[in-house]
């Protein structure tokens, strides 16, 4: 078993643990949590979740640990990864879920503390970080190549699978992406200071345009799309579930029915479990709790002039993404010698 510690027990950290608890054949064993909050608070937030509801599990806590269904997970609280007891706890893999230690220099502090490898639950910044998206390039994972790997962002995980299908079948020349994204913890719930002046505005009452590197990051996992995609995010007053709107110019003329056909086929075959397809007239809350990375909404696919293609895909930016973090961690575990 690969011994796992979670650094940062926020939205993704707790979703990761819930996803892992739902696996019956996991090669992972979560043994530790580092978070600024205390174990009793973290146990409460694990049990009661505004998006996911009450966790059906036997949960208890003391001053130093959380116990879930008889599994005791040690807890510590230290903002400096160099001080963490990863060596003492024999930690193999750290799930870096704070959103803070996203560079190689920052993430490898966990290695200096005794862990063997780090998986960042965010886009990595800078060199020497391997970026993998399950269903796109995770099959190329080489265990000895990187100490630090990244699961990219939730939006890249949504975009890359169906973007790859479009590129493979029609050839993407260039395009833009807009993600209409639920607000996150990196926004203010009331107007307050923030380095991004738009994210400084109250998240629950505004549409907040902001940057996203998701479109450009697709090139990290699909190299032939280097320099071909860009995009922005519109943060909206919903707490979960987001939707990607991709518009691309393609080399091979097509029609909407043909685009939907190849996407539906991929969802049922090569990308099954990662990509789903629907033509039902649904809304964002219908996709809450979906395990896949993206669900193409075929009813909204458009083609203009044969070579301009518009595809819409929904994603649960918390739960679906966290499922892929578990998947990637399982890939790491299976490659351990």
From Swiss-Prot:
It is found in: Cytoplasm. Keywords: Cytoplasm, Glycolysis, NAD, NADP, Nucleotide-binding, Oxidoreductase. SMART domains: Gp_dh_N. Its main location: cytoplasm. The record marks 181 as: Activates thiol group during catalysis. One of its GO terms (molecular function) is glyceraldehyde-3-phosphate dehydrogenase (NADP+) (phosphorylating) activity. SUPFAM superfamilies: Glyceraldehyde-3-phosphate dehydrogenase-like, C-terminal domain, NAD(P)-binding Rossmann-fold domains. Its EC number is 1.2.1.59. Pathway: Carbohydrate degradation; glycolysis; pyruvate from D-glyceraldehyde 3-phosphate: step 1/5. GO terms for cellular component: cytoplasm. Pfam families: Gp_dh_C (PF02800), Gp_dh_N (PF00044). Transmembrane segments: none annotated. GO terms for biological process: glucose metabolic process; glycolytic process. It catalyses: D-glyceraldehyde 3-phosphate + phosphate + NADP(+) = (2R)-3-phospho-glyceroyl phosphate + NADPH + H(+); D-glyceraldehyde 3-phosphate + phosphate + NAD(+) = (2R)-3-phospho-glyceroyl phosphate + NADH + H(+). CDD domains: GAPDH_I_C (cd18126), GAPDH_I_N (cd05214). NAD(+) binds at residues 11-12, 35, 79, 121, 317. D-glyceraldehyde 3-phosphate binds at residues 153-155, 184, 199, 212-213, 235. The active site is at 154 (nucleophile). It is an enzyme of class 1 (oxidoreductase). The keyword Transit peptide does not apply. Homotetramer. Involved in photosynthetic carbon assimilation. Catalyzes the NAD(P)-dependent oxidative phosphorylation of glyceraldehyde 3-phosphate (G3P) to 1,3-bisphosphoglycerate (BPG). The first reaction step involves the formation of a hemiacetal intermediate between G3P and a cysteine residue, and this hemiacetal intermediate is then oxidized to a thioester, with concomitant reduction of NAD to NADH. The reduced NADH is then exchanged with the second NAD, and the thioester is attacked by a nucleophilic inorganic phosphate to produce BPG. It can use both NADP and NAD. Belongs to the glyceraldehyde-3-phosphate dehydrogenase family. This is Glyceraldehyde-3-phosphate dehydrogenase 2. It comes from Synechocystis sp. (strain ATCC 27184 / PCC 6803 / Kazusa). The lineage of its organism: Bacteria, Bacillati, Cyanobacteriota, Cyanophyceae, Synechococcales.
């Amino acid at each position: 078993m690969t011994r796992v510690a979670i650094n940062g027990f926020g939205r993704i950290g707790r979703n990761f643990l819930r996803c892992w608890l739902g696996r019956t054949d996991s090669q992972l064993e979560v043994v530790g949590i580092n978070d600024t909050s205390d174990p009793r608070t973290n146990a409460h937030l694990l049990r009661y979740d505004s998006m996911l509801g009450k966790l059906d599990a036997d949960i208890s806590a003391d001053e130093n640990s959380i116990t879930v269904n008889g599994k005791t997970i040690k807890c510590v609280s230290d903002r400096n990864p160099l001080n963490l007891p990863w060596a003492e706890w024999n930690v193999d893999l750290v799930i870096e879920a704070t959103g803070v230690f996203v560079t190689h220099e920052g993430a490898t502090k966990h290695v200096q503390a005794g862990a063997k490898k780090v998986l960042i639950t965010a886009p990595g910044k800078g060199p020497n970080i391997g970026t993998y998206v399950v269903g796109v390039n995770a099959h190329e994972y080489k265990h000895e190549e990187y100490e630090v790997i990244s699961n990219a962002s939730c939006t890249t995980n949504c975009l890359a699978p169906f973007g790859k299908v479009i590129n493979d079948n029609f050839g993407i020349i260039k395009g833009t992406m807009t993600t209409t994204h639920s607000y996150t913890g990196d926004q203010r719930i009331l107007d307050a200071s923030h380095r991004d002046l738009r994210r400084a505005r109250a998240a629950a009452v505004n549409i907040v345009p902001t940057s996203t590197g998701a479109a450009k990051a697709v090139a990290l996992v699909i190299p032939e799309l280097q320099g071909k995609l860009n995009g922005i995010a519109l943060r909206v007053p919903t707490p979960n579930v987001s939707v990607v709107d991709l518009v691309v110019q393609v080399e091979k003329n097509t029609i909407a029915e043909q685009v939907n056909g190849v996407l539906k086929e991929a969802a049922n075959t090569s990308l099954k479990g990662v990509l789903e397809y629907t033509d039902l007239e649904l809304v964002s809350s219908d996709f809450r709790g979906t395990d896949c990375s993206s669900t193409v909404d075929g009813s909204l696919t458009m083609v203009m002039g044969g070579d301009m293609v518009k595809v819409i895909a929904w994603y649960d930016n918390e739960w679906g993404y966290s499922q892929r973090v578990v998947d990637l961690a399982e890939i790491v575990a299976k490659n351990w010698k």
